[in-house]
């Protein structure tokens, strides 16, 4: 028992040192401004240990601590300012009106901190309350581990944080590291910091890292930060942003007013809605833009009113671009991005195109839609371009078509030149014949005059 007493005392003084190192209003875990220095922080005024100086601020939060009386076996009280260590091997190292009411409880200091669960610890602060077993409040102001079921829970510091159990569901293993008015109501939850964040009673093993007015009301949900974000179904995640809502196994990395309720869906940007399973919806911040919404499962929708570029090389020398307002892709074709440039024979290309089989067909996945074009195997065998014999890139198809068109144009030009030459020769002959006929007409006219 003497060992238990010494251990409790050592823990108490360690917690005091931890609180002092954290500075006013915080522990190592952080929190909003509040006094955690115990009696040393009280002003030296007349009256019941300076209590009048606190009346205006603290009246609404008074715990009537301590809630127990008497002296526990092997207990220790470091000061006489209304502190009570009623539990076995309990310790109150200092402060004012603190209570360590159950077995092995420790209050390091502060004002009106109270413990009624076993093996609890409060490092300091004001008006902190622990009723669950094996639970800890590091400091702060008005924090509460409120029910006996909240065992193995932790509040680091802050202001009016709560680990609650309104529906009598076990809320063991929960942590509120700091902040103000944060609340967790289910098992194994974590709130890192922030203001008015809420974990619902069915949201076991959920987490809110920080931010303001965020909520997780389903198990295994996560909100990283931001404001007014909500996870409504299990395993959903919101990274941050404002006013976002995620459903089951859905993800919103951030942005504003995005909704991802489809199972396994993703929404990002501003005003995106992914309400079908497997949807990916991303919307830009274009002024006055219409809301972007998925219309079927497993869609990929994106709006970038300033244009889209996909690069397929690390040096940004190959890729495709969809220009702002455009309806077709533009391939990167800068001469500076190319090498091993050699000329081609347009006539050879045309000859190969002439012998290339062209068919009408449907993809096996869209049997109701017809297309016209070559097979990749025939195209690769004819021209030996592209990555393999299973794909035809539009840049290769366009290049072949342009070369064939050039060859056809050259043929037409040669034929036109030949026809022009023939026509010119005929015109010359016609002109000669016309001159001959004119001369003959003159001669005939002269003969007629001489005969008269």
Which functions belong to the PLM regions below?
Residues 22-25:
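Bacterial signal peptide processing site
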Residues 28-30, 48:
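Boundary at the C-terminal end of the N-terminal hydrophobic targeting segment
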Residues 1-9:
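Bacterial N-terminal signal peptides that target proteins for export
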Residues 298, 304-404, 408-452:
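C-terminal intramolecular chaperone/autoprocessing and neck/assembly modules of extracellular spikes
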Residues 35-39, 418-421:
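Long, low-complexity repeat tracts used as extracellular stalks/passenger repeats
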Residues 37-321:
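Periodic small-residue-enriched repeat registers in elongated scaffold domains
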Residues 18-20:
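C-terminal motif of bacterial Sec signal peptides marking the signal peptidase cleavage site
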């Amino acid at each position: 028992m003497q060992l238990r007493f010494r251990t409790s005392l050592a823990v108490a003084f360690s917690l005091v040192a931890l609180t002092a190192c954290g500075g006013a209003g915080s522990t190592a875990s952080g929190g909003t401004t509040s006094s955690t220095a115990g009696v040393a922080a009280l002003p030296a005024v007349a009256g019941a240990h300076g209590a009048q100086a606190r009346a205006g601020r603290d009246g609404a939060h008074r715990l009537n601590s301590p809630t127990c009386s008497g002296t526990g076996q092997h207990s220790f009280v470091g000061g006489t300012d209304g502190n009570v260590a009623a539990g076995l091997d309990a310790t109150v190292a200092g402060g004012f009106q603190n209570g360590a009411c159950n077995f092995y409880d420790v209050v390091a200091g502060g004002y009106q901190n109270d413990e009624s669960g076993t093996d609890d610890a409060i490092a300091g602060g004001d008006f902190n309350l622990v009723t669950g077993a094996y639970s800890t409040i590091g400091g702060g102001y008005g924090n509460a581990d409120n029910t006996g079921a909240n065992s193995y829970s932790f509040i680091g510091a802050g202001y009016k944080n709560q680990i609650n159990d309104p529906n009598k569901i076990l809320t063991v293993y929960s942590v509120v590291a700091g902040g103000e008015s944060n609340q967790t109501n289910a098992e194994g939850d974590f709130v890192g910091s922030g203001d008015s964040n809420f974990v619902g009673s069915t949201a076991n093993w959920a987490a809110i890292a920080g931010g303001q007015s965020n909520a997780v009301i389903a198990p295994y949900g996560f909100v990283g930060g931001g404001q007014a974000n909500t996870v409504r179904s299990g395993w959903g995640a919101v990274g941050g942003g404002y006013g976002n809502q995620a459903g089951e196994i859905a993800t919103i990395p951030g942005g504003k007013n995005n909704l991802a309720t489809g199972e396994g869906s993703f929404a990002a940007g501003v005003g995106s809605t992914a309400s079908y399973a497997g949807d990916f919806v991303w919307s830009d911040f274009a002024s006055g833009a219409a809301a972007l919404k998925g219309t079927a499962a497993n869609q990929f929708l994106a709006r970038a009113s300033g244009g889209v570029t996909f690069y397929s090389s690390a040096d940004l020398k190959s890729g495709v671009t969809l220009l702002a307002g455009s309806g077709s892709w533009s391939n990167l074709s800068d001469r500076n991005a190319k090498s091993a440039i050699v000329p081609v024979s347009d006539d050879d290309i045309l000859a190969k195109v002439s012998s290339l089989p062209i068919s009408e067909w449907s993809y096996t996945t869209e049997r109701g839609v017809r297309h016209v074009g070559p097979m990749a195997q025939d195209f690769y065998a004819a021209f030996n371009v592209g990555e393999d014999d299973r794909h035809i890139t539009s840049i290769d198809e366009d290049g072949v078509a342009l070369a064939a068109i050039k060859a056809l144009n050259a043929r037409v030009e040669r034929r036109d030149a030949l026809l022009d030459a023939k026509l010119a020769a005929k015109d010359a002959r016609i002109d000669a014949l016309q001159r001959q006929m004119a001369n003959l007409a003159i001669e005939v006219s002269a003969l007629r005059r001489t005969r008269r």
